[in-house]
């Protein structure tokens, strides 16, 4: 048969409720000591780990942005420096070109002046030589004229003959 204390809907007793509450309180204390605190410690540790990972990621992102800005600055500076170097090289090349042209012009003027002075000297030498030859020829002709009395035709033939001899000597 049925036992009276196991029947559903049986009477509620204050002692059973107190014992149940006491057992539940002990269970809560035990759970808090052995499960809740370690679980909360693990959760706190996990929270701190995630927080430190987030902080590290933020710091890495900030460093990356800083490095990117520095690299952009260095790249821009390198571009400016290379442009300056190119401009300087162009200016230096232009100056050297102008200097080479000036030097070539001076050299050509010097050569031209040397050629003019050489021509003038050669001309003077030729004129001197011609004067000497004319002087010698005049003396020779004069001595021949003195030796014989020549008419105009003979005198002309004599001069022509000496001029031809002079041309043959050269």
Swiss-Prot record:
One of its GO terms (cellular component) is plasma membrane. It is a single-pass membrane protein. Its main location: membrane. Keywords: ATP synthesis, Cell membrane, CF(0), Hydrogen ion transport, Ion transport, Membrane, Transmembrane, Transmembrane helix, Transport. It holds the Pfam family ATP-synt_B. F(1)F(0) ATP synthase produces ATP from ADP in the presence of a proton or sodium gradient. F-type ATPases consist of two structural domains, F(1) containing the extramembraneous catalytic core and F(0) containing the membrane proton channel, linked together by a central stalk and a peripheral stalk. During catalysis, ATP synthesis in the catalytic domain of F(1) is coupled via a rotary mechanism of the central stalk subunits to proton translocation. Component of the F(0) channel, it forms part of the peripheral stalk, linking F(1) to F(0). This is ATP synthase subunit b. It comes from Listeria monocytogenes serovar 1/2a (strain ATCC BAA-679 / EGD-e). The lineage of its organism: Bacteria, Bacillati, Bacillota, Bacilli, Bacillales.
């Amino acid at each position: 048969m049925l036992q009276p204390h196991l029947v559903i809907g049986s009477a509620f007793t204050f002692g059973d409720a107190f014992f149940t509450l006491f057992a539940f309180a002990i269970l809560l204390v035990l759970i808090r000591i052995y499960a809740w605190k370690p679980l909360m410690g693990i959760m706190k540790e996990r929270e701190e780990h995630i927080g430190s990972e987030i902080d590290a990621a933020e710091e890495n992102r900030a460093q990356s942005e800083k490095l990117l800005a520095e690299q952009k600055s260095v790249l821009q500076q390198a571009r400016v420096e290379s442009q300056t170097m190119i401009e300087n090289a162009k200016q230096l090349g232009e100056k050297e070109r102008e200097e080479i042209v000036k030097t070539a012009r001076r050299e050509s003027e010097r050569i031209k002046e040397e050629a003019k002075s050489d021509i003038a000297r050669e001309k003077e030498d030729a004129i001197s030589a011609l004067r000497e030859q004319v002087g010698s020829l005049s003396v020779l002709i004069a001595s021949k004229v003195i030796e014989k009395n020549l008419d105009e035709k003979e005198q002309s033939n004599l001069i022509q003959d000496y001029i031809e001899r002079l041309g043959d000597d050269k």
